[in-house]
Structure formats: structure tokens, C-alpha cells
Amino acid sequence: MTTTPNTPLPNSLQKPLERFYEFLRSEKGLSLHTQRNYKQQLETMAHHLAEMGLKDWSQVDAGWVRQLAGKGMREGMKASSLATRLSSLRSFFDFLILRGEMLANPAKGVSAPRKKRPLPKNLDVDEVNQLLEVNEDDPLAVRDRAMMELMYGAGLRLAELVSVDVRDVQLRSGELRVIGKGDKERKVPFSGMATEWVGKWLRVRGDLAAPGEPALFVSKLGTRISHRSVQKRMAEWGQKQSVASHISPHKLRHSFATHMLESSNNLRAVQELLGHENISTTQIYTHLDFQHLAQAYDQAHPRARKRNDDKSD
């Protein structure tokens, strides 16, 4: 029998759903929007269940749930929507277990595939140099140049850059104390150009910073600069310096990681510099464009030069 959303479900499937909806309303206190989402997803799955000839929720096993997830993927369902579907199903089965109507939750071990987030395109070295050719005496321009030099020179996250205090910077040794994710502290070196421009900024910082303000980088109001202000200023400098790519703080960090890996090929060192807990996170930065790979191959492979030299007549 083929069912549609307008086809009445058998009581053995519909009644447990109605009890669950009442449970969501009276005991869980979920918003109407969430309740509607759960109902929509569960009704859809109940009709799939009926189409497959199953007459009771207790007949559902992990294989059926995986089949349902696969069907959603093949139909182009978004990862977030599939995650909502599986979440509602897990909650429903937990409810049936509490009522003694099921022994185990068949959806517990099934998860939606994670949506791969595309990494931003990194800047090439020429673009970075073009961006960092800011050479103005205005205190805000000096601050912005120092921020960009430090972010690219030390591979900082935006939150890390904003949270840096004056006391965290050791100009003589070129060392920076950083508080990263999970409040984990690390010390990182930074570039000579970052040292130069942070030093210039410190000489004019007192003209802007409010008394007692510990932040290294401050706004026009004299307080710690905000994440949004950093993003806005970097984007503006990208346009002003005629850099083709849109400039963002993460793109500078990404460029730092890519350029360091291209130059050193030391994944473990870059992991430490970036503050990644797992090296698998750092490995996403190892993508190199084909041109770079081809150049590296031609320079390193013993047969490559001969191949290039042996041109056919």
C-alpha cells in the first residue's frame, strides 16, 4: 500500500505519535516551532514506515533508520534537515522506551553526515604583501597595520587577536602569549615586521587607550576593539589596497598556515603555532593548488626535468 501525507496512518503508528506530541507540549515545554518540526519529520517517517509494510514502531531497527538517512541524502536533503529528522526520531524512541513500548533506541547510533565547510581561499604571498603595504602615520592606520601584521605573522584567530593584552607581548624576543580555545595558553613567535609595527602602535596607543585599559588593540573609544570592528577594518584595507580577494581575519590565518606548510612541510610545528588540539584539524590546511604541486614535482622528481626537456619534434 502506498501512503501519502494525506493518507490516514494506522492507529498502531498514529497513537504513539499523538502521545508523544502531548508529552512535548505538557512536559518538555518546547516552542511551537520545534513541536511543528518534530511533528512534520515524524509524520513523514511514519508514512515511509507504512510504505515498507511495517505496522508498529517497535519493528524499526537501526538498518531502517540508516536506510531512511540514506534516502534523505539521495533526495538532496540538507545535512541540517537530516540531523533534525534523526534528532526527532531519537527523542521519540526515547519516549517509547520510557513507556516500556521499546527496549532500545534504533536511532541512537545513526548520525547525519557533517556538512563540509569550504575553506576560504588563501591569499598568495604577493596579495599579502600588497595588503600590508599600509604606510600611514594616522594612529588608526598604524593600529590596523599592526593587527594585520600580527595576525598573519603569528597565525592568530580573530578572538585571540582581540583578547591580546599589552602585557602578553614581548617585543625583544618576538614572543606572544596567546589564550586560545578552551582557555588554553600557548606562546608563539611572530614576524619581524609584526614586531616593528606593534612597536610603532605601542608608541601611539596611549593617545587612544582609556586609562587602565589592558587591551593591546583599542577602538576610537579607547576600549578593547570588537571582533566586528576588526573584520570591517580589514575588509576596508583590502579594498583600499586593491587586493582582488575579500580580506577577512580568518583568511589571514589560513594564509599563514598554508604558506608555513608550503615552506616548511612541518605539519606538527604548524599545529602548535595554530593551537590545534588535533593534527587532523591542521591537515585541512595542507591543500595545495595543482600549480604548486606541479612545480614541486618538476623541481624534485628525477624524471621530471628529463620529461620537460624531451620535447617532441
UniProtKB/Swiss-Prot annotation:
Entry-linked Pfam families:
Phage_int_SAM_1, Phage_integrase
Name the predominant localization. cytoplasm
Q: Which GO terms describe its molecular function?
A: DNA binding; tyrosine-based site-specific recombinase activity
On whether Cell cycle is a keyword of this UniProt record, the answer is yes
Which keywords does this chain's UniProt record carry? Cell cycle, Cell division, Chromosome partition, Cytoplasm, DNA integration, DNA recombination, DNA-binding
Against PROSITE patterns, the record matches this protein to:
CB (PS51900), TYR_RECOMBINASE (PS51898)
Per UniProt, residues of the Tyr recombinase domain are 118-298
Q: Name one GO cellular component term.
A: cytoplasm
Where does the UniProt annotation place the signal sequence? none
Keyword DNA-binding among UniProt keywords: yes
Where is the catalytic site?
A: 157, 181, 250, 253, 276, 285 (o-(3'-phospho-dna)-tyrosine intermediate)
Share an example GO biological-process annotation for this protein: chromosome segregation
Q: Which domain of life is it from?
A: Bacteria
Q: Which residues form a coiled coil?
A: none
What's its job?
Site-specific tyrosine recombinase, which acts by catalyzing the cutting and rejoining of the recombining DNA molecules. The XerC-XerD complex is essential to convert dimers of the bacterial chromosome into monomers to permit their segregation at cell division. It also contributes to the segregational stability of plasmids.
* Recorded family membership: Belongs to the 'phage' integrase family. XerC subfamily.
Assembly notes: Forms a cyclic heterotetrameric complex composed of two molecules of XerC and two molecules of XerD.
Report the PANTHER family cross-referenced here.
Answer: PHAGE INTEGRASE-RELATED (PTHR30349), TYROSINE RECOMBINASE XERC (PTHR30349:SF81)
Q: What is this protein called?
A: Tyrosine recombinase XerC
Species name: Vibrio campbellii (strain ATCC BAA-1116)
Lineage of producing organism: Bacteria, Pseudomonadati, Pseudomonadota, Gammaproteobacteria, Vibrionales
The coding gene here is xerC
